[in-house]
């Protein structure tokens, strides 16, 4: 989603309305599928947010086939309809050993233009 796309969908910035007007979706339209490319774009945008010491410790697995979602079923105790009807399940993991790759993570951030070299040099 680009900035213009986000602004088009943005309707309200009132914290109380957002907090108390939220919904928890329990059933999805089984006929609507989010493309793999769109899921990747959403993950890339979400991970643009800063993390502690900019280590980006998150890792993702996208289960989007019926077979892969079926493998998850024994692990889901509640709200199984969400797994059954969703376009995909996105599993989010935290890398507890990310500090071991700190230098590589910082170098990659500089290469991708996500971190200035002078900030990287201070790490």
Name each region found by the language model.
Residues 2-123:
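Acidic, surface-exposed loops and disordered segments
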């Amino acid at each position: 989603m680009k900035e213009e796309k986000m602004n088009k969908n943005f309707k309200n910035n009132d914290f109380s309305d957002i907090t108390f007007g939220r919904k928890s979706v329990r059933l999805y339209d089984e006929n609507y599928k989010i493309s793999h490319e769109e899921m990747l774009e959403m993950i890339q945008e979400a991970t643009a947010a800063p993390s502690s010491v900019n280590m980006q410790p998150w890792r993702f697995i996208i289960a989007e086939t019926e077979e892969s979602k079926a493998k998850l079923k024994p692990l889901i105790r509640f709200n199984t309809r969400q797994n059954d009807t969703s376009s995909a399940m996105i599993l989010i993991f935290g890398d507890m050993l990310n500090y071991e790759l700190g230098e590589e993570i910082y170098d990659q951030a500089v290469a991708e233009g996500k971190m200035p070299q002078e900030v990287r040099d201070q790490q």
